[in-house]
Amino acid sequence: MAESRANPASPGTRSYFNAPVFAVAPMIDWTDRHYRFFARKLSQHALLYTEMIVAEAILRGDRQRLLGFDASEHPVALQLGGNDPVKMAEAARIAEEFGYDEINMNVGCPSDRVQSGTFGACLMQEPETVAACVAAMKAAVRIPVTVKCRIGVDDQDPEVALRTLVAQVVEAGTDAVWVHARKAWLQGLSPRENREIPPLDYGLVYRLKQENPNLFIGINGGLQTLSQALEQVQHLDGVMLGRAAYHDSAMLTAADGHFPHPLTGAAPVAQEAGVFTERGHRLDLDFWADVRDVMADYAAGHITNGGRLIHVTRHMVGLFQGWAGARRYRQILSSDATRQGAGPEVIHAAFDAVFEAMAAKQAAE
């Protein structure tokens, strides 16, 4: 079992998860409950995050719609947006009642919409506010409370800004810090540009870990492959992939062979040589047939409850990159899933296009 690292700033409380942790980053409009259900079929050990949900929305809105999730999604963390300690604490308490495994505070999103609410990355300029929110949430819940931040914003010196924030949230009792290892520019860059243009500084995050050996520190930003993720955990306690894991979701099937289960500490799953592609995609067609059947059943249930097939299948389009039949798979999901009355048969047809192409390829070899 991997070592479980406890935060010395909060003695007696539950420690954070078993390291090293592999996580899929919170992504607005992407990591909704349908994506997380799908991702969990691909990896049992990945820590999954919700898209950011504003604390005020939880207090005033439809909590079941905002917070409800399938039990199979565990381990699953809720990312909260906000800056009011009282509201953040109450939202965290409600989320704990729903069964989430972690509450994560967003101190990294630079979008105009998030800035207009004075939360997200702009809170890098208000470490005292972040610390107050962390302390209030820690007092309200028993599950881990964590922070996801940038290394700084605008003209801040990252060497100072990151250390200042981390020192204050450690004092407040945070269980972990996840760092997107680049600055955010609050004006002049779009959210997409803020993920690509500011230079990465992994070295600063490594130094932060050396200075805080008992604090769980994970890294995010610029990571595209499982190999790159494995390199990061030579230095840190966790690694978080975002869009790469979403657009090439089959890579999640290899994660369990390298990372323990965050909650149980179950060891990485032994994987036979030759059962994965160079991209880290599992080749076992029986496994993929099970994914097909489970997702078709899930989609049928969603449709029965008034939803549309596209709500589910939009998260599945990136599967099978580089495989025979992948183009036809994408065509089916992109076109047929949007038609009126589309049902789970579309998922069967898309997967079967890959299976048939793979069988033809193998027969020709």
List where the protein language model places each region:
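Alpha/beta catalytic cores of nucleotide-metabolism and tRNA/nucleoside-modifying enzymes
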Residues: 1-18, 22-23, 28, 135, ...
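Glycine-rich, positively charged N-terminal anion/phosphate-binding segment
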Residues: 2-11, 16, 27-101
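Conserved beta-strand positions in the central sheet of alpha/beta enzyme cores
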Residues: 23, 48-49, 77-79, 104-106, ...
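Active-site beta-loop-alpha junctions enriched in small/polar residues
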Residues: 27-29, 53-55, 81-83, 108-110, ...
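Short secondary-structure transition/capping segments
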Residues: 59-63, 115-118, 158-159, 189-192, ...
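Short, hinge-like loop/turn segments at secondary-structure boundaries
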Residues: 65-69, 121-123, 163-165, 194-197, ...
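Alpha/beta enzyme core
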Residues: 89-103, 107-119, 128-215
